[in-house]
């Protein structure tokens, strides 16, 4: 059984082997027949070539006429071989060119198929060319018989005409001797060849209509087959110099560049695709040098195409995954590619691009999408864009069309409408900042200025909500909450900051010009600090030590975080980023508003917030001082020497400086003119009077610290250093401390500062120029002259003989001061008159008082953070220091003042008589009354309701001979119950205007 099975297997194996052998023999036989067939064909062709060649030679040896030349052309295409028949080809082509030259109609005797076959011979010839090859007759034939016909040109391009031509070019250029990537000079032979290759694009007299397909093949040859250095050093610059939008066939070449699909149509490897893309981009952007000299439609077409083209190739570059090639060839290619990238960037920031961009931006029907796509390059000369009414109006129309209500979706962060909004704000900002206050005409800035600013104001709030979105409940427990919050903030940051910037610029101008209605900036219908309340609790989080944070209210967290942000240096704003990310969105929004656009919050809301900041600081100071048993400092001053006695105590000193005491409750003891201590214990009222009298003395222009503008506004006296000597800055620093204490205690002082002075005190940017508009309050005549200067022509300015220097006289010391280095050597002309005006204003309103302003600023900052004042505009800071100039009415005072009778029985008639007397007091008497009762002549900024303790009037039974008295620490007026109205009015006026100390108390 087993034996039979083995025999069966052996039999089957033998059958398989025989089958394999038979198949192998059949394949070998077929291969042999194929080789024999090929060999027989080759022998036949070889013999035929020999016969044709012999016949060709016989014909060519005879007298060559028209028929002989045609016969030679017919024979040549049948036997032509490289390295054997080059001379025969050149001879034939030479004869054909001669005949065409002598007889234009001869061309028709040569069939198109015959011409194309000869063109194929030319292509073979060129592919085998060397640097010594004579190419004249080849190109003459191609020009006269092939490329002059569109159909033949396209057919020959399919056969590899461009590859052959550029092979010859590279043979002429030779192997590079170095690796330098730079423009090379073209010798006459190379220039001639390039001109012949590109003849259909550079020679109008010999141009043939070139299809997009032919142009595509030309571009592929240039971008894929040419060696790196030959393209970057020769071909690129030839194309840049010689091919222009006005050149023949440029339209189809341009269309080919736009429509090229490198990855799908050219089908090249990723590393080749990268190089091809960069070469194509460099050719495309090279046209920038010619665009500005073309027709408007050409400019429009170029820029509209450029935006799409660059975006398309940017996607290609991002999609490629090119591995680094560290070979010598790879390093050279990388170097050339980097050069091409730099070349493209340089072209897109060149003066030529700037000129063309200016033309494009001013064309009617400009495509906003194009400039948005190219905003990286257009933004480099934003002044040109901003100057184009056509573009800016089109940009705003684009925004209004896509988001009429200023609504954006979270996914819109990178959308064209958001980019348009950012660009629009930057353009508008450029316009606003370039216009002096005195030349400000809203409709010149933008045709619909008022509505536009209102739109941006409302959009700013919506953008803040997109920067700090309320996360869904599911996100709160996911692991990527911080990433989502960070992404939202990053995505919307640029456009939001642009909106903030333009709103800030317009607001600063509005502060000075009072253009918008008083409530405009806060009339947005949004509660921007919503959710910040005493009773809303912050979510507790775990501290680094593992313990849970103490429960805090949203309001407390907001105030503390805001104080920390104001104190933070600009370069450390993100030090606490992780902690910020843990804040609720509503808190982050509120902080963002107060940090960037506080002016959209109503003034009184900011006053309340500022009070919270002060109270928090006082609480901290109280904890660190009184908590250790410190009861606050006391000072004794003479009533007629309040300023000097206070200066002796609180002036800046190297040792024993008592500046920190000013953050505590200072108790004052007054000594009267007779040298006796005044009665009364300071519960706050005496200090208020002390501070008021001290500052009144400091601001008295007769003391020399300050002087008046023409509008009777105070600013530091430029001659103070000459009057006060070495102690000058110490006095101003001391005055700054007292102003800081005034603000710290929320006390008011009757004083009107020049806005340019108060703005410099609280300005965070020390390099900011003072606007010419401030000169109007400083000296209207000088303001008028400076305005006139800006409108003069060169002849008028030359007659004035002005230079960049001014003459000053300080206490009899006459000096000539240069407004800039060697200023006396520079004449004022039309070109620099604006610079002269700017420097002149800065010198008089800033430079002359700079050291004193810095001293005042330093003094204030020792008591209260200057940064806290950023939430207020200069005119609001004036209110914070001096209150409102309007005098209170009896009705306002009565609402928050309690009147009682010591006897316990109310006398309605007497009460009404008292309030009627108050109502009839003059404004000066009302101020005197308020100072008599509270120690301050101005009502609080936020009204009498904020006075603590509450104001009161106590009517006591007494005789008509007694005078009213007050307890300023209690804000209480004690008034006898006089027998009649006349007596009441007489005694009250006498008491409040007596100027007495606390002897009446």
From Swiss-Prot:
The entry's keywords: Coiled coil, Meiosis, Transferase, Ubl conjugation pathway
Domain of life: Eukaryota
The protein's annotated pathway: Protein modification; protein ubiquitination
Entries under SUPFAM superfamilies matching the protein: Hect, E3 ligase catalytic domain
Listed InterPro entries: E3A/B/C-like, HECT_dom, Hect_E3_ubiquitin_ligase
Domain IQ: 28-57
PROSITE patterns for this protein: HECT, IQ
Ranges where the HECT domain occurs: 658-1001
Residue runs in coiled coils: 66-115
List of catalytic residues: 969 (glycyl thioester intermediate)
Any one biological process term the GO annotation gives: positive regulation of metaphase/anaphase transition of meiotic cell cycle
Gene null: resulting phenotype: RNAi-mediated knockdown causes a reduction in progeny viability. ify-1 and cyb-1 accumulate in the cytoplasm during meiosis II. Also extents the length of meiosis II and causes retention of rec-8, a component of the cohesin complex, at sister chromatid cohesion. Causes a delay in oocyte budding.
Enzyme Commission number: 2.3.2.26
Catalytic activity: S-ubiquitinyl-[E2 ubiquitin-conjugating enzyme]-L-cysteine + [acceptor protein]-L-lysine = [E2 ubiquitin-conjugating enzyme]-L-cysteine + N(6)-ubiquitinyl-[acceptor protein]-L-lysine
Subunit structure: Interacts with ify-1 and cyb-1.
Name of the protein: E3 ubiquitin-protein ligase etc-1
Natural source organism: Caenorhabditis elegans
Name of the encoding gene: etc-1
């Amino acid at each position: 059984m087993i034996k039979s099975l083995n025999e069966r297997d052996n039999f089957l194996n033998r059958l398989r082997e025989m089958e394999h052998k038979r198949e192998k023999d059949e394949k070998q036989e077929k291969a042999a027949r194929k080789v024999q067939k090929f060999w027989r064909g080759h022998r036949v062709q070889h013999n035929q070539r020999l016969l044709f060649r012999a016949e060709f030679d016989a014909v060519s040896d005879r007298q060559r006429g028209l028929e002989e030349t045609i016969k030679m052309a017919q024979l040549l295409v049948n036997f032509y071989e490289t390295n054997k028949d080059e001379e025969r080809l050149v001879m034939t082509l030479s004869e054909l060119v001669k005949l065409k030259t002598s007889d234009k109609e001869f061309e028709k005797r040569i069939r198109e198929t015959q011409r194309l076959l000869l063109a194929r011979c030319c292509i073979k010839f060129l592919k085998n060319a060397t640097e010594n090859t004579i190419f004249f007759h080849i190109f003459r034939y191609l020009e006269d018989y092939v490329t002059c016909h569109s159909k033949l040109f396209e057919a020959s391009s399919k056969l590899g005409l461009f590859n052959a031509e550029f092979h010859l070019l590279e043979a002429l250029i030779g192997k590079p001797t170095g690796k330098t990537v730079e423009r090379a000079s073209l010798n006459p032979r190379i220039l001639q060849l390039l001109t012949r290759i590109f003849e259909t694009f550079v020679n109008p007299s010999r141009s043939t209509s070139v299809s997009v397909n032919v142009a595509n093949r030309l571009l592929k040859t240039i971008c894929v087959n040419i060696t790196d250095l030959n393209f970057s050093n020769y071909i690129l610059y030839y194309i840049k110099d010689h091919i222009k939008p006005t050149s023949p066939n440029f339209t189809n070449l341009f269309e080919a560049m736009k429509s090229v699909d490198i990855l799908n149509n050219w089908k090249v490897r990723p590393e080749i695709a990268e190089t091809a893309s960069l070469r194509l981009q460099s050719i495309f952007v090279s046209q920038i040098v010619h665009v500005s000299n073309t027709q408007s439609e050409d400019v429009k077409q170029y820029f509209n195409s450029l935006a799409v083209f660059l975006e398309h190739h940017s996607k290609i570059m991002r999609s490629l995954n090119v591995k680094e090639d560290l070979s010598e060839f790879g390093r050279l290619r990388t170097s050339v590619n980097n050069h091409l990238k730099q070349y493209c960037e340089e072209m897109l920031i060149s003066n030529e691009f700037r000129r063309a961009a200016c033309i494009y931006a001013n064309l009617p029907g400009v495509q906003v999408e194009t400039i948005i796509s190219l905003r990286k390059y257009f933004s480099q000369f934003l002044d040109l864009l901003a100057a184009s009414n056509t573009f800016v109006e089109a940009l705003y129309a684009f925004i209004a069309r896509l988001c009429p209500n200023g609504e954006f979706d979270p996914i819109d962060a990178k959308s064209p409408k958001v980019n348009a909004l950012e660009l629009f704000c930057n353009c508008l900002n450029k316009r606003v900042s370039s216009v002096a206050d005195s030349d400000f005409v809203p409709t010149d800035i933008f045709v619909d200025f008022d509505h536009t600013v209102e739109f941006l104001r409302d959009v700013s709030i919506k953008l803040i909500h997109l920067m700090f979105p309320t996360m869904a409940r599911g996100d709160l427990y996911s692991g990527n909450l911080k990433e989502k919050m960070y992404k939202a903030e990053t995505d919307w940051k640029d456009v939001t900051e642009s909106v903030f910037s333009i709103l800030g610029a317009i607001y600063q101008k509005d502060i000075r010009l009072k253009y918008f209605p008083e409530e405009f900036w806060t009339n947005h219908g949004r509660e921007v600090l919503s959710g910040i309340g005493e009773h809303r609790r912050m979510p507790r989080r775990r501290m680094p030590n593992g313990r849970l944070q103490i429960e805090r209210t949203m309001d407390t967290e907001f105030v503390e975080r805001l104080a920390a942000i104001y104190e933070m240096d600009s370069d450390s704003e993100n030090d606490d980023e992780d902690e910020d990310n843990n804040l609720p969105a509503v808190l982050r929004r509120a902080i963002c508003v107060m940090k960037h656009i506080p002016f959209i919050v109503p003034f009184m809301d900011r006053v309340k917030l500022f009070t919270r900041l002060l109270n928090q600081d006082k609480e901290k100071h109280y904890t660190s001082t009184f908590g250790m048993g410190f009861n606050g400092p006391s000072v004794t001053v003479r009533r007629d020497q309040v300023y000097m006695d206070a200066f002796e105590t609180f002036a800046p000193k190297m040792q024993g400086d008592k500046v920190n005491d000013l953050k505590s409750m200072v108790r004052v003891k007054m000594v009267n003119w007779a040298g006796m201590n005044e009665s009364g214990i300071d519960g706050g009222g005496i200090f208020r009077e002390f501070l008021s009298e001290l500052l009144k003395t400091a601001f008295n222009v007769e003391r020399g610290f300050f002087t008046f503008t023409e509008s009777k506004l105070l600013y530091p006296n430029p001659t103070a250093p000459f009057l006060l000597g070495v102690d000058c800055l110490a006095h101003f620093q001391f005055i700054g401390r007292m102003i800081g204490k005034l603000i710290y205690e929320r006390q008011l002082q009757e004083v009107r500062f020049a806005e340019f002075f108060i703005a410099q005190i609280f300005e965070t940017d020390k390099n900011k120029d003072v606007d010419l508009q401030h000169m109007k309050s400083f000296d209207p005549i000088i303001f008028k002259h400076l305005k006139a200067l800006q409108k003069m022509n060169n002849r008028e300015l030359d007659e004035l003989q002005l230079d960049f220097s001014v003459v000053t006289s300080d206490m009899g010391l006459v000096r000539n001061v240069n407004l800039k280095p060697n200023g006396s050597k520079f004449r004022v002309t039309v070109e620099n008159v604006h610079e002269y005006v700017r420097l002149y204003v800065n010198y008089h309103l800033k430079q002359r008082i700079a050291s004193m302003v810095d001293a005042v600023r330093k003094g204030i900052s020792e008591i209260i953070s200057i940064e806290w004042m950023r939430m207020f505009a200069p005119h609001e800071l004036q209110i914070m220091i001096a209150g409102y100039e309007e005098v209170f009415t009896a009705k306002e005072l009565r609402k928050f003042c309690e009147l009682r009778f010591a006897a316990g029985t109310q006398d309605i008639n007497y009460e009404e008589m008292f309030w009627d007397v108050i109502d009839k007091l003059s404004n000066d008497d009302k101020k005197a009354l308020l100072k008599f009762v509270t120690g301050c002549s101005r009502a609080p900024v936020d009204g009498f309701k904020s006075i603590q303790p509450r104001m009161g009037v106590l009517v006591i039974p007494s005789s008509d001979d007694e005078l009213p008295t007050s307890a300023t620490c209690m804000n209480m007026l004690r008034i006898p119950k006089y027998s009649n109205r006349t007596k009441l009015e007489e005694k009250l006026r006498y008491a409040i205007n007596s100027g007495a100390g606390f002897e009446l108390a």
